[in-house]
Amino acid sequence: MNIILLSGGSGKRLWPLSNDIRSKQFIKIFKTADGYESMVQRVYRQITEVDKDASVTIATSKTQVSAIHNQLGDSVGVCVEPCRRDTFPAIALATAYLHDVKGVGPDEPVVVCPVDPYVNKCNCDWLLPCLHRWLNSFYNNRCTKYCTI
């Protein structure tokens, strides 16, 4: 499954913890057995635990690339926006990146979601496999090109 995670915003809603320099998705606020993890670490972990073969690409601004690599490692796919232009241009650029750089075909399903949702593990355990089956059924029947959840 091809997944685009949107992580381009400045994320000031957790002010004073977050600001233009330190976006909310990188603040380690979720307690784990090993310490704390950030929103981006949590959603990435949840996706890869449920679907180890998921191809995850993070759409982000150039100011956040080092934070993403610092928290997720250098092997995660990153599509860098030259400047922040809001959600639709970020999705358009990321899908062009999937097509041109990663070789994703125009008929392959792509899931787009933000990096800052709060999803319990039990929701991930059933949601991602259902979404995978659902997208494959659309892909096999060619019913639609996109969906929003």
Regions found by a protein language model. Name each.
Residues G11:
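N-terminal beta1-alpha1 ligand-phosphate binding loop
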Residues K121-I149:
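Conserved core of the sugar-phosphate nucleotidyltransferase
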